[in-house]
Amino acid sequence: MKYILFIAFILSVVSCAKHDGYTLTGLVPEAWEGKPVFLVLDDTNQPHFIDSTKISGGKFKFQGKFEVPRYCTINIYLDPNDRQTRSKIINFSLFIDSTAVEATCNYSGKHPVFQISGSGTQTEYQNYLSEIQPMEDDRSKT
């Protein structure tokens, strides 16, 4: 419970700060060149697409402004004509606040893993998940 209160406190402090906008830069394999990337606002009852771009030179970039930190999902469609087959969609979720955020793809294993840096809200969320992981592990044993 105290972790939830801590997260709520951090989010309220961050939301009171002046927001000049965010920049989200993604670094991905160059093999994904030209693939469409969508930014989805995912913290509402109805997720919706708010921006899109294409991968160029192994990178994609979104810029915008949120009044408060928002939970978003990035969807990369490896086959733009097939947006239903899960194996042809790469996605990851993150908090975006008014900072420069970078998402770097590590595709050395079977599935791509994104390392997120630059977002204070995302860092706090990752710390929170790390703190509750032992409780989740204990719960799954019972």
Model-found features: residue ranges?
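Sec-dependent N-terminal signal peptides
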Residues: 3-13
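A non-transmembrane, solvent-exposed segment enriched in polar/low-complexity residues
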Residues: 16-142
